[in-house]
Amino acid sequence: MTEFTKLRWLLSAAGLVMYVADVCTDAALVLTYFKEKHVVCAALTLLFIVVGLLVTQVFSTAWYWDDMDCDEKREDMKTTLPVVSKRGLATLHLFGVGIFIRYYQMLKRGFGVAWGTVEPVEEIKNQQHFLFGLAADLSMLRLLEAFLESVPQLLLQLYIVLGQQECSLVQLVGMSFSFMNAAWALVDYRRCLRRSLPDVRQMPRGLPTAIYLLYKLFTITSRVLGYALLLIFSIYSTVGLAIVWLLGTAWTHRLHTDFCSSQSLEFLYRAIVGVILTFTFFNVKGQGTRDAMITYYFLHSLINVLSLLLLFVLRPDLLTLAALLCVSTLMAACSVLGLVCLVLYYLLLHPTEACREADEVDGLEIKTRSKGRLRDFLYP
């Protein structure tokens, strides 16, 4: 049986620290921009923070309500806030503490399991089961927050830094934490997803995890750099980004996803998936992905080449030659290394499963609502 170990507890605590640090550095950026009279930059930075916070609170509330309405919920699977009503939970989330409540639940119960303060064997099994359900919900919320706040924040800061051709300490720290927060969310989500699938081997630690992480980080970095160059070329490139988002949202809508219990939340979910697809590839509904992935990364490479050509040929005055060569080299290297890591992972390191296609699919029997949500969410 998979166990919630001391290491898992410590990593969960580290994830909470990373989340708080990312929010704090972004808040520091907002204050810095306001002090420097950069009102637009401050407003955009604050907007990304608020959007990420608001969306995660909405989904966290909806999932708590779904769990409270679940007829099959057992006594040991209930929330650690039994005296709180639906209205009370909504009020707590209104103050933006939804993720903190979930971390409190997981760290409190996880401490008892990992450090052996829970005695009966059956109780330990129940707690293990509940803890991995909490981890599943948190991994999805952190992924949403990463692509609605951290990654757009990284794009904005890169655009500002490249445009000004200088980088302050606050900007450097903010970009670093946004980068690490996105990386943490990606790996944690991947591991939680595979752990939730009953007939699928867990994602191995060590080299496979490192290669998968590098694949995602390299491809996201090259994509963000390409978008930043397009924005430097013309601020009207935001129209192009909006079109890319609309295409991703339309594709998700065409797949008829059924992640949410309400139609309005389902439309919001599809719009968010469109944002995620703007920056990285995810298997939206467990269908075969080879052709879709090839098409996606071909277009990804095309956008990167286009952004470089536009700056080199039409607006070489916007960046110094040294800066342009540095960004071009970094973007090309990240694109190549990301695709190499992608091929290495899926050819040599991806866990093979018996009685299952290469891509995990929906429709399996589930043991908890949290794990059921996870299987219907996204497939990396």
UniProtKB/Swiss-Prot annotation:
It catalyses: a 1,2-diacyl-sn-glycero-3-phospho-L-serine(in) = a 1,2-diacyl-sn-glycero-3-phospho-L-serine(out). Keywords: Cell membrane, Membrane, Transmembrane, Transmembrane helix. It is found in: Cell membrane. The keyword Endoplasmic reticulum does not apply. GO terms for cellular component: plasma membrane. It holds the Pfam family XK-related. The keyword Plastid does not apply. It is a multi-pass membrane protein. The chain crosses the membrane at residues 10-30, 39-59, 81-101, 167-187, 228-248, 264-284, 294-314, 329-349. It comes from the Eukaryota. Belongs to the XK family. Phospholipid scramblase that promotes phosphatidylserine exposure on apoptotic cell surface. Phosphatidylserine is a specific marker only present at the surface of apoptotic cells and acts as a specific signal for engulfment. This is XK-related protein 9. The gene is xkr9.
